[in-house]
From Swiss-Prot:
Organism placement in taxonomy: Bacteria, Pseudomonadati, Pseudomonadota, Alphaproteobacteria, Hyphomicrobiales
InterPro entries on file: 3-IsopropMal_deHydase_ssu, Aconitase/3IPM_dehydase_swvl, AconitaseA/IPMdHydase_ssu_swvl, IPMI_Swivel, LeuD
Pathway named in the protein's UniProt entry: Amino-acid biosynthesis; L-leucine biosynthesis; L-leucine from 3-methyl-2-oxobutanoate: step 2/4
SUPFAM superfamilies per record: LeuD/IlvD-like
Name of a matching Pfam family: Aconitase_C
Name the record gives this protein: 3-isopropylmalate dehydratase small subunit
Designated gene of the protein: leuD
């Protein structure tokens, strides 16, 4: 998993509440277990018209936001079913950070396991960041995970809190496998000792 230390990029505003995982990645795209290629299905029902053409009014189809790396979203983002394809789709599109006032628990935890940083802020701070993200080509935010702060285009700073363990995992690029590999030496030592003490096992 790629480390997340500091990210400076275009932030796209999506002031929609209760965006569920089916909206993030519709069920038609769940037939694969590959993590790549899902970016085309991200927000597909909002991104595309019935004939498959792009909806020009959808934020990620607008020229200023096509390469957005940060999403500023409405409350209760990621609710609904527990599909891990949702953070996969965000990451494959290029979005590495989602900022909201709240997230569904399963989606929130899945993000950390897949290299997407979900940040929770107050309604007042979200309103400011949403305004920053609405500046089109000037909608650039800097997310500093080490300092736990978001810096806007005008230099304003929004502080955020994050569990120390989750922060450690993101800073060091550790998913579940990475965490296990951190203990590889201890595991090998235990197995050797166990084999010596219990040769019959």
């Amino acid at each position: 998993m790629e480390k997340f230390t500091k990210l400076t990029g275009v932030a796209a505003p999506m002031p929609i509440v209760n965006v569920d995982t089916d909206m993030i990645i519709p069920k038609d795209y769940l037939k694969t277990i590959k993590r790549t290629g899902l970016g085309t299905g991200l927000f597909a029902e909002m991104r595309y018209n019935d004939d498959g053409s792009e909806n020009p009014d959808f934020v990620l189809n607008k020229p200023a936001y096509r390469k957005a790396q940060i999403l500023v979203a409405g409350d209760n983002f990621g609710c609904g079913s527990s599909r891990e394809h949702a953070p996969w789709a965000l990451l494959d599109f290029g979005i590495r950070c989602v900022i909201s006032t709240s997230f569904a628990d399963i989606f929130y935890n899945n993000c950390f396991k897949n290299g997407v940083l979900p940040i929770t802020v107050s309604p007042e701070d979200l309103e400011k960041l949403m305004d920053d993200a609405s500046r089109g080509s000037n909608a650039t935010l800097s997310v500093d995970l080490e300092a736990k702060e978001i810096r806007g285009p005008d230099g304003g700073v929004v502080k955020f809190d994050l569990d120390d363990f989750k922060r450690h995992c993101m800073l060091n690029g550790l998913d579940d496998i990475g965490l296990t590999m951190e203990k590889a030496g201890a595991i090998a030592s235990f197995e050797k000792k166990n084999a010596e003490q219990r040769p019959w096992a």
